[in-house]
């Protein structure tokens, strides 16, 4: 059995650049409908990728972000400011609406969607891998988030997000994780502890 854990925001963001839209009616105050277009490219891309993974012996677990209130609070208490991801530039495309729409679709069709208020997807993915590690022959984490690369182990690999990102397993880990360094998969916890990202 395989478990594929998907960091859905990666897929939605990547697919959002396709500029696909869906027409939706919006009731106006004068009781007339006016066409309104909503972006759908990210949702479409995510659903296509999921359909490509569906086969016997494969479980698929989509994971969605929530506002990282817990980390922000911890950061503020530890460092005395609100700086957790505060200095990052805003993304070129806002995917919030598409994330909500994709999550609703996946829940409605019966996928075991995971999202925990106060936490980002990478926090939830870490917990899922630790919980299910011994229940599956192979776990694939579909993400471009390098913070999750330390989870690579004998039965845990990083999978691409569509055509983007890296495929990382214990054999390719030393060559792909940190450019110009030779880092063995089973030493990454120590490296992150000593040197950070």
Walk through the language-model features, giving the residues of each:
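Domain-level signal for Mg2+-assisted phosphodiester chemistry and nucleotide/NA-binding surfaces
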Residues: 1-107
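Extended two-metal-dependent nuclease catalytic cores across DNA- and RNA-processing enzymes
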Residues: 85-197
């Amino acid at each position: 059995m395989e478990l594929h854990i998907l960091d859905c925001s990666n897929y939605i963001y990547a697919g959002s650049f396709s500029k696909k839209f869906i027409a939706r009616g919006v009731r106006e105050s004068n009781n007339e409908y006016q066409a309104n277009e909503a972006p759908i490219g990210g949702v479409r891309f995510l659903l296509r990728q999921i359909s490509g993974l569906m086969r016997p012996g494969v479980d698929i677990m989509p994971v969605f972000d929530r506002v990282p209130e817990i980390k922000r609070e911890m950061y503020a208490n530890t460092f005395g400011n609100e700086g957790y991801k505060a200095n990052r530039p805003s993304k070129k495309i806002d995917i919030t609406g598409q994330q909500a729409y994709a999550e609703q679709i996946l829940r409605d069709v019966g996928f075991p969607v995971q999202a925990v208020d106060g936490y980002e997807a990478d926090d939830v993915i870490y917990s899922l891998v630790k919980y299910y590690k011994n229940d599956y022959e192979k776990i694939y984490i579909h993400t471009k988030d390098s913070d999750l690369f330390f989870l690579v182990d004998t039965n845990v690999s990083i999978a691409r997000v569509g055509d983007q990102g890296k495929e990382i397993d214990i054999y390719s880990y030393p060559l792909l994780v940190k450019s110009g360094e030779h880092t063995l998969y089973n030493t990454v916890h120590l490296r992150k502890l000593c040197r950070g990202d």
